Regions:
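Extended recognition/assembly regions associated with phosphoester-bond processing machinery
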Residues: 1-190
Length: 190
């Protein structure tokens, strides 16, 4: 692995949170416990470099009755609904505080239920919700939206975090097609 990869004293990895959805489609049910955990690691020793990896399926864009496998037209509205969901407020507050804490890094890895996070408007909205205009907080977030995974060193160990859908033939993301969609959006093409 590359020698220029980040090094941390501690790395915590959580996968498949699936924030969002209404009624029976809402998978995540323990906002207070997750918020407590995020706050706990944010307030560990201020001298230690700590990373929190949300390892895919952070937001569940598929958790509603009318879900499409990829819905760029409604993605920002769906993300807004997740941020506005009162049942999830504790988690968002804890994540906002986490990225405002020195020596803390939040790493977001794309999964197969939150592909829309890679779309420019959705990424912008997500970062605005987490950081507002706090550039220091923004500098503590890493986005891994290209299927490369997140690699780092923890003490002498090498760590690689991938969501895992890339080895599941039923849930593979076509990253080249996603890149073409993003290019078209950035260039104002239909």
């Amino acid at each position: 692995m590359a020698s220029d990869q980040p090094t941390y004293d501690e790395v915590y990895v959580i996968s498949d949170i699936h924030l969002g959805g209404q009624g029976d489609f809402q998978i995540f049910k323990d906002s207070q416990r997750l918020a407590w955990f995020i706050k706990h690691i944010a307030h560990l020793s201020a001298e230690r470099k700590i990373a929190l990896v949300l390892n895919g399926d952070i937001v569940d864009f598929l958790a509603d009755q009318d879900a499409k496998c990829f819905d760029p037209m409604r993605a920002v509205a769906k993300l807004e609904a997740v941020f506005d969901n009162l049942a999830l407020q504790d988690v968002w507050i804890a994540l906002r505080d986490f990225v405002r804490t020195k020596k803390r890094t939040l790493i977001l890895v794309l999964g197969n239920h939150d592909i829309e996070l890679a779309l420019p408007a959705v990424t912008h909205h997500l970062l605005w919700e987490l950081c507002s205009d706090d550039e220091s907080a923004r500098g503590r977030i890493m986005l891994i939206f290209d299927n490369s995974g997140f690699s780092c060193s923890v003490a002498r160990a090498q760590v690689l975090c991938v969501h895992g859908n890339e080895v599941d033939k039923y849930n593979i993301i076509d990253y080249e097609a996603l890149r073409h969609v993003i290019v078209a959006i950035n260039r104002g093409l239909d």
